């Protein structure tokens, strides 16, 4: 009777699968980041370069990729502010903000449109970069990027993982 010999390739297969996953995560997160940058508005928030601060990070141990932006303004860009906030949970009414003073005060005052514009004009006359607003509409650059790339990224994952496993 012929002798059957079993060769355990599970370690090599697991390593190849892990390498394929890591390569794919870098590719997918890089593409998602690039599309998010393209979807972002050019310097909407004065000194904040939201567009130029989108980055991705791959945790090779967890086989996870994260796309994000360290700027608080990226949150505003994604979800909107004030009366235009995506979940309708923003401030209501007009307020004045000074560029560079990003953290809202707990005693934030609200005004009529006319009052807010007059106060902003006065502050600008004092050399401050002041603006009257009732909010900013959400742009959703990350959400739009994910939505537009989801099917492509799934197909690409199948290609990359399938090619490495042959």
Model features per residue range: what roles?
Residues 1-74, 78-166:
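Short, Lys/Arg-rich flexible segments
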């Amino acid at each position: 009777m012929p002798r059957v010999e079993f060769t355990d390739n599970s370690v090599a297969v697991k390593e190849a699968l892990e390498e394929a996953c890591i390569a794919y995560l870098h590719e997918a997160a890089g593409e998602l980041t690039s599309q998010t940058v393209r979807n972002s508005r050019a310097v909407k928030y004065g000194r904040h370069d939201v567009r130029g601060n989108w980055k991705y990070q791959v945790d090779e141990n967890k086989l996870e990729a994260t796309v994000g932006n360290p700027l608080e303004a990226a949150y505003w860009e994604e979800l909107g502010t004030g009366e235009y906030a995506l979940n309708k949970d923003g401030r209501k009414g007009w307020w004045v903000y000074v560029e560079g003073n990003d953290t809202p005060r707990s005693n934030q005052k609200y005004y009529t449109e006319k009052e807010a514009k007059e106060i902003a004009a006065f502050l600008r006359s004092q050399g401050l970069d002041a603006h009257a607003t009732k909010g900013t509409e959400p742009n959703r650059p990350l959400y739009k990027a994910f939505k537009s790339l989801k099917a492509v990224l799934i197909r690409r994952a199948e290609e990359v993982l399938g090619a490495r496993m042959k």
